């Protein structure tokens, strides 16, 4: 499970939480695009990636 700080960041700004774990990898870019198109899909993806 992701650390508390990563998940907390992901709730408010999803790409930041993913960036803290994966850097500028594919997960970050997918999360950024999802968040730009609609916040909720980006949030769901960020929580999923951080807790898998």
Swiss-Prot record:
Subcellular location: Membrane
Topology term for the membrane: Multi-pass membrane protein
InterPro entries from the UniProt entry: PMP3
Record's GO cellular component terms: membrane
TM annotation in the entry: 4-24, 30-50
Pfam family, one: Pmp3
Keywords: Membrane, Transmembrane, Transmembrane helix
Stated family: Belongs to the UPF0057 (PMP3) family.
Name of the protein this chain belongs to: UPF0057 membrane protein At1g57550
The species this protein was found in: Arabidopsis thaliana (Mouse-ear cress)
